[in-house]
Amino acid sequence: FDVTLLFQEVKKGFMFADDHIIKAIQNLEKNNIIIVVVSSKIGRFGQGKSFRRFCKERGHRFLSATSLGDVNETYFDIFMETMNVSHTKMKKRAMKIKKMWDKAKTIRVKTEAGTDVTFDVEGMKAIINIGDYHERGSGGNMPAGEVYIPPKGYYGVHGKVVVDGSMRTEDGAILLTKPLVLYIEKGRVVRIEGENAHLLEKTFTKHEDRAKYPYRVRHAAELGVGINPSAVLIGSLILDEKVYGTGHIAMGSNYWFGGEIKTIYHGDQVFKKPIYYVDGERMEY
């Protein structure tokens, strides 16, 4: 194999990738393989499309492990163990969930901590992340282990989300000891409460100041469920959102996985012990 290793400075989500990275990937022959391992983000390409969409159009398969700067060295063994999992069993669980979500009109999530949020998902398709990327143009992040879906349009989410797992901010992920509460009306976060509310508010504001359409930043963009039985909460979103027995919600962009919202921000927030109701029926998974 002809392998090329490329390095660049640390990038935030709104920053552009270094020129030599952009040039190398744009000039890569079709149907190649790209592996991204970065402490934060790979950066933007300035093509009006996401890295994922770029890879799909060129037939590249890819693996990405982002935000590794959030992983404490003491958790490295735990992080690696999440990849030592039966992907066959995980796929079976993922396909069961996807089948239900693809047919759903609404998905409601409740938790003992107080989460009660409803997503209108009629006509939307769930995405599975199980680490199986054999087809050209496919790819995803590692460790694997989640199913997620965008809401229908901009306004199809309402309710309250009590984030008691981990939260994503501009400065990295935080393993929560006290919950963060998000109030969502007509698809948009209208109020944030909790000890760390100012950190998420700062994150939203920072991206709104840079976004072409600032109002999109606070829109609910994703509902997800973790299905990796080897994963545990460590304060790194790339792992935390995969933990079996957790759920997550994201605000910001979702156009690259079938949604309508396109913006420079995408941030996941993780909550514990979710119960999902698909068109009123409790989901067993």
For each predicted feature, which ranges?
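Dual-mode signal for accessory low-complexity, basic/Gly-rich regions
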Residues: 175, 191-251
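Acidic, glycine-rich active-site loops and adjacent beta-strand->loop/helix elements
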Residues: 40-42, 229, 253-255
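Active-site bordering "gate/hinge" segments
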Residues: 1-160, 166-177, 185, 275-285
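Internal helix-turn-beta structural module
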Residues: 234-284
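Histidine- and/or cysteine-centered catalytic micro-motif in compact active-site loops
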Residues: 122-124, 164-167, 185, 189, ...
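Short, solvent-exposed amphipathic alpha-helical segments in soluble enzyme
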Residues: 50-54, 123-126, 177-180, 198-199, ...
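Active-site lining segments that contact anionic ligands and/or coordinate catalytic metals
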Residues: 158, 177-179, 186, 218-222, ...
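Structured core elements
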Residues: 108, 118, 160-162, 181-183, ...
